[in-house]
Amino acid sequence: MMRAISNKIIRSLCVLGLGYLGLHLGHPPSALADLGCSNATLKGTYLFAYDGWQIDADGVRKPGAFSGIEIYNGDGTMRGIYSGGVDGVVSRMVGYTGTSTIHPNCTGEQTFTDDGTGLVTHNDIFVAPSGEEFTFVYTDPGIVSAGSERRVKFRVGKPERD
């Protein structure tokens, strides 16, 4: 009888423990919280830099690095300019446009279109609730790259100093 009660208690504790882990590891509360973000969170001028790899059809990794400046309009639209290169082939001062969808939990998706080539790329984005900075990772096949952006303040003619 005592052994049956012990087994029942142990099983109950295991079920409770697994339930707790499922609730807290399966869906972290902080990742699902409404942090107040929206497309309006990204507004202003941002500087960025990132590096990574492009992987061609034969599986050959080609190193790449880029930096540039982007202007977000606070309505999910933006424009930017970058310089960078992949595997030693450099592109300078290339313009592009893009759209962002920022969710209340400060995650989102971005789509960019290169002005010259029409190439379309995609990112997942993770935004600070203040909109001061964000990180991103490319989600297109064959691109392994991530980076960050930080909002900067400009006055007409020269950078503003904090």
Where are these regions (language model features)?
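Short alpha-helix boundary/capping motifs
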Residues: 1-2, 131
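Mature soluble binding/inhibitory domains
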Residues: 26-162
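Bacterial N-terminal signal peptides that target proteins for export
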Residues: 2-16, 22-23
